[in-house]
Curated annotation (Swiss-Prot):
The gene is rplK. Part of the ribosomal stalk of the 50S ribosomal subunit. Interacts with L10 and the large rRNA to form the base of the stalk. L10 forms an elongated spine to which L12 dimers bind in a sequential fashion forming a multimeric L10(L12)X complex. This is Large ribosomal subunit protein uL11. Keywords: Methylation, Ribonucleoprotein, Ribosomal protein, RNA-binding, rRNA-binding. Belongs to the universal ribosomal protein uL11 family. It comes from Shewanella frigidimarina (strain NCIMB 400).
Length: 142
């Protein structure tokens, strides 16, 4: 008989930096999951990413308190800011622009995010990432 799923927990944890402190500890502790086991497995799986990069993770908790987890690609906003070398986007994106990004760089980000996005094709995903860039106060140029 298959294990029954008790809960899904969605978190954003820095790559290689999962530890029992909030937000990881309380979220997993409520469901009775072994926190240190998750932290060790997550840190091992995210070694290939740049340390400190936020990694979305979906943890599936089963009724016997075991778990599995799936890591996603970093958020598009983080990848865009990293590409232009900024710490944060604009507080007023329509009036205050904070940087420019090439369309080719946006397409690279869309290709990186393709596994997690539900776009019909790479062009649609690129347009979606361009919209994210504009909402952050970045100008997309050819």
């Amino acid at each position: 008989m298959a294990k029954k799923i008790e809960a899904y927990i969605k978190l954003q944890v820095a790559a290689g930096a999962a530890n029992p402190s909030p937000p990881v500890g309380p979220a997993l502790g409520q469901k009775g999951v072994n926190i240190m086991e998750f932290c060790k497995a997550f840190n091992a799986r995210t070694e290939k990413f740049e340390k400190g990069m936020p990694i979305p993770v979906v943890i599936t908790v089963y009724n016997d308190r075991s778990f599995t987890f799936e890591t996603k690609t970093p958020p598009a906003s983080f990848l865009l800011l990293k590409a232009v070398g900024l710490k944060s986007g604009s507080g007023r994106p329509n009036t205050q622009k904070v940087g420019t990004i090439k369309r080719s760089a946006v397409q690279e980000i869309a290709e990186t995010k393709a596994a997690d996005m539900t776009g019909a094709d790479i062009e649609a995903m690129t347009r979606s990432i361009e919209g994210t860039a504009r909402s952050m106060g970045l100008v997309v140029e050819d």
